[in-house]
């Protein structure tokens, strides 16, 4: 698996993310060619140009930057990644990670837009199943809470019919029985 970035830095300041430690925060979004070059350089280094039995079998968009803030470039990259004359990765060989933006793009929520226009696996960075704690870990939760995220994830599933991955880093303060019960409750509502 290769992990790709969509920007240089990130201004979301998620507490558990190494990118949040960069002093300048978001420097800029990456261009399509810069996103693509990450996998091209790795494939070239590994001599991984076979059409079957690839060394890099899957790719995750989980590096620096929030996918939802570079959608147009990400969409073009994913088209290249999926195209059988280019990188030739199927939709289930690519996972796009997001903190769960519920803002709008072209009259759709970002998550719904990703489902309609990108059509890959989606991974949601949750990291706490309790809003008050997620507010501290991931300040974007104050704007887009878990409660606002769940209906958007259901829409994503209806569009793609792909299960949604829940990302949850085990931290000292998010492993209680209360957290586990809240996480189970969320996962019962979201096809994951």
Describe the predicted segments one by one:
Residues 1-37, 41:
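Canonical Radical SAM [4Fe-4S] cluster-binding loop centered on the CxxxCxxC motif
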